[in-house]
Amino acid sequence: MRKVNRIYRKIANQRLDSLHKKSTEIANQYGIVCVEDLDMKAIGNKGFGNGKATFDNGYGMFLNMLEYKLKERGKYFVKVGKWYPSSQICHCCGSVKKFDLKDRVYTCDCGYIGDRDHNAAINILTEGLRILQSL
């Protein structure tokens, strides 16, 4: 049993080290970081893959580390509301289209065609900057 505990402790320490290194790298590289305020509990319960694996990846811990490291450096960490339809808005023209989760390519009437996640990331950044300006 001690051997198993030692292995789990080693894995936890490696994960913690990895999260610290990546959050430090991002905090040093960027002045503003905008993220979607995801409800990880709901995602884990809905069973996108393995629920335990969703909690086990340390996403919440990573965001906490990133937030305090950015603030220590006088930089900005902005959370965009979980109900903001980032993947449904065309970042080029602003039109809104509903898609199924299985649809990975965003196609808009304005002619924009691109990866749905990339489009959502641009929208999260744009909304985060808007939120930051309103403070």
Predicted features, each with a name:
Residues M1-L135:
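Positively charged, helix-rich recognition surfaces that bind polyanionic ligands
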